[in-house]
Amino acid sequence: RDGFPKFQDLPWDYSLTNWPGLTDRLEEVQRGISRHPVVFVNYEGSLYAIKELPTGVALSEYQMLLKMQEQHLPCVEPVGYVQISTGNCQRSAIITSYLDLSLPYRSLFMHSNLGRYRDHLLDAIAGLLVQLHLAGFFWGDCSFSNTLFRRDAGALQAYLVDAETTE
């Protein structure tokens, strides 16, 4: 998309799991659990998440996130997707902007100073589900692992970060 890096200098010939040591752009950030390889890259101080997926899935997720963003729903910002063909290997990747000041749900349990937010977890994710439903979206894999949270005036705001199973 316009206004974002082109990401052409990344080692796309390799799976994301092999990127450490292949690019200086990798950043370690606090993250949740993911069933797919995920890396974070830095371009001039802006962080981006890249998630490797089976062929075609990244395009579908990218399109769903664009639709959600157009409706101003709380989700990560889609930046682009990549279709990768290397030899017999076919895969894809989605690129999203890193959600600044966000926390994976596990952080709310691991850090004692965040304990007051634990009671707001269910309210936040329920609120997200209501917003998605009212906008006509179905989220087939709703879980805390597919959600990030931002603190908001003593409460939490939930953000969808994994749209693989949305319709």
Identify the role of each PLM range.
Residues 138, 144-167:
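Catalytic activation segment of kinase domains across protein kinase-like and atypical kinase folds
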Residues 6-140, 156:
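Conserved ATP-binding subdomain of kinase catalytic cores across diverse folds
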